[in-house]
UniProtKB/Swiss-Prot annotation:
Function: Mediates E2-dependent protein ubiquitination.
Protein name: E3 ubiquitin-protein ligase At1g63170
Domain writeup: The RING-type zinc finger domain mediates binding to an E2 ubiquitin-conjugating enzyme.
Record localization: Membrane
Membrane topology summary: Multi-pass membrane protein
Disulfide bridge partners, by residue number: none
Catalysis performed (reactions): S-ubiquitinyl-[E2 ubiquitin-conjugating enzyme]-L-cysteine + [acceptor protein]-L-lysine = [E2 ubiquitin-conjugating enzyme]-L-cysteine + N(6)-ubiquitinyl-[acceptor protein]-L-lysine
GO cellular component: membrane
Pathway: Protein modification; protein ubiquitination
Transmembrane segments: 74-94, 107-127, 189-209, 224-244, 245-265
Stretches for region Disordered: 1-23, 135-161
Length: 381
């Protein structure tokens, strides 16, 4: 668990909604964690630090989901899917030219197709924006490595190029933010219109009844299929968000293990993690517990953390409520190996090492362990 706590949080993107056509931004995972925290506050089912860790995990899943949702295969699939809706709608409109429904179903189908095309435009804009940002993030690294290899560059010239590069990236960033804001507003408006359009379509289809089914079967059943797809995908997305939210709250180590297995290494390297202090936990007997409580000035000692791999080990006495890992919610057992981060928070080695491989920040307070290691290396130099 920990000796100090701070927190921060952000959003979840669910890339579905309405027939797989529209991206819907939700905060399902984090809201599920907060709901569980409020529900359990009176019964103390799960303590505050454990809930903060789960909110951080939900945020990490949101970022991963956002990246996966705008990966090339998913974007291509989304584009083909929506294009198929447009093609089918166009074909049915042509084939049903002799049908005269008593409700304006053709208008509804045309509006549905336009929303599909609008969604495709928004997805393409967002995909291009993310690709350009990724290339821009990689270019400073390549330029810095090339500049370090070319020793002939003058210092003033290097500073001038760096300044010009910073200005150029600032202008590109501002332009990207404007485009991103426009695309977000456009997608939000499209989502809102889609919901209203779905209600209108449902009203027209249900009002027409059997007369529509018999007199204009092609238009009628196409509307039924489109409405059904929308309902299916909305229910699927809500159910998926609930399942993942419950999994984050109740089975966080499993989620971390899955991310560790499938995700690329974007956090700390094995060398960075091995540099962090490792401790062994030791439970204390009643007599020793009384002595430790008096020495440390703590009400109820849960055990002692002893530093590993050093001739003069440091020891920390842990209060009873801190003698558990707030990732897996398991109490520390005798001879359990713990990892203490530079911020002072500690967890099971097996739990936190996988987390740091994915994200180099403390799961509780979001302190970046790489900043700490870089600072220490700078001092040694």
């Amino acid at each position: 668990m920990s000796r100090e706590t701070t927190t921060e949080a952000t959003p979840l993107i669910l890339t579905d909604g309405g027939g797989g056509r529209r991206s819907v931004r939700r905060q399902g995972l984090r809201e599920a964690a907060r709901l569980l925290r409020h529900a359990s506050s009176g019964r103390m089912m799960m303590r505050e630090p454990s809930m903060l860790v789960r909110e951080a995990a939900a945020e990490q899943l949101e970022e991963r989901q956002s990246d996966w949702a705008y990966s090339k295969p998913v974007v291509v699939l989304d584009f083909v899917w929506n294009l198929a809706f447009v093609v089918v709608a166009t074909a049915v409109l042509v084939l049903s030219s002799d049908e005269n429904p008593n409700m304006p179903l053709r208008v509804w189908i045309i509006g549905y197709g336009l929303q599909c095309m609008m969604h495709m435009v928004c997805v393409c804009v967002e995909y291009r924006r993310r690709n350009s940002r990724r290339r821009r993030d990689l270019s400073p690294r390549s330029s810095s490595s090339s500049s370090s290899s070319s020793s002939s560059m003058d210092e003033e010239e290097g500073l001038g190029l760096s300044r010009n590069s910073d200005e150029r990236y600032l202008e590109l960033g501002q332009l990207e933010n404007e485009n991103n804001s426009f695309a977000k507003h456009l997608e939000s408006a499209n989502t809102m219109i889609s919901f209203i359009w779905w209600v209108i379509g449902f009203y027209w289809v249900s009002s027409g009844g059997q007369e529509l089914a018999q007199g204009s079967p092609q238009l009628y059943w196409l509307c039924i299929v489109f409405l059904g797809f929308d309902v299916f995908f909305v229910v699927f997305c809500v159910a998926l968000a609930c399942v993942i939210g419950i999994a984050v709250c109740c089975c966080l180590p499993c989620i971390i293990a899955v991310l560790y297995a499938v995700a690329e290494q974007e956090g700390a390297s094995k060398e960075d993690i091995d540099q962090l202090t490792k401790f062994k936990f030791r439970k204390v007997g009643d007599t020793m517990k009384h002595t430790v409580d008096e020495e440390q000035g703590q009400g109820d000692s849960g055990g002692v953390m002893t530093e590993c791999g050093t001739d003069s080990p440091v020891e920390h006495a842990l209060p009873h409520e801190d003698a558990e890992c707030c990732i897996c919610l398991s109490a520390y057992e005798d001879e359990t190996e713990l990892r203490e981060l530079p911020c002072g928070h500690h967890f099971h080695c097996g739990c936190v090492d996988k987390w740091l491989y994915i994200n180099a920040t403390c799961p509780l307070c979001k302190y970046n362990i790489l900043k700490s290691s870089n600072y220490e290396e700078g001092e040694e130099v």
